[in-house]
Regions:
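Active-site nucleotide-donor binding segment shared across nucleotidyl transfer reactions
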Residues: 1-32
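Glycine-rich nucleotide phosphate-binding loop and flanking beta-alpha elements
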Residues: 16, 36, 76, 95
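Helical scaffold of the NTase/Pol beta-like nucleotidyltransferase catalytic core
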Residues: 1-9, 88, 92-98
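Phosphate-handling catalytic interfaces
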Residues: 56-85, 93
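Compositionally biased, low-complexity linear motifs
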Residues: 25-27, 83-88
Length: 98
């Protein structure tokens, strides 16, 4: 995988980036031509942000080692909205940082 400014890493990878827990896969949001299994399908229901906001507004992403990641706040809000049992655990992990 090479850095691409039109792709944003999301999901549990962000928790791994902060040392909160390991991730098992890499979820992506694509600015152009997203595959059907991308996280673009969850933008309206779980993220409540526009694609343009996530990809282009620095308030909602950060760079690490050349790769673009959604911020921890974006993941926290997404997990609160989705509210699965694993998400509630992850929200507690995120809140333990503050």
């Amino acid at each position: 995988m090479k850095p691409n400014d039109n792709e944003v890493i999301t999901g549990s990878t962000i928790l791994s980036l902060y040392g909160l827990r390991d991730c098992k896969d890499i979820d992506l949001i694509y600015y152009k031509d997203p595959p059907t299994d991308s996280h673009n399908q969850y933008l309206e229901t779980h993220y409540k942000l526009t694609l343009d906001d996530i990809v282009n507004n620095p308030r909602y992403h950060l760079y690490y080692n050349g790769f673009k990641y959604v911020t921890l706040d974006v993941i926290k809000n997404m997990k609160k909205l989705r509210n699965e049992p694993k998400d509630r655990i992850d929200v507690k992990l995120i809140e333990s940082l503050k």
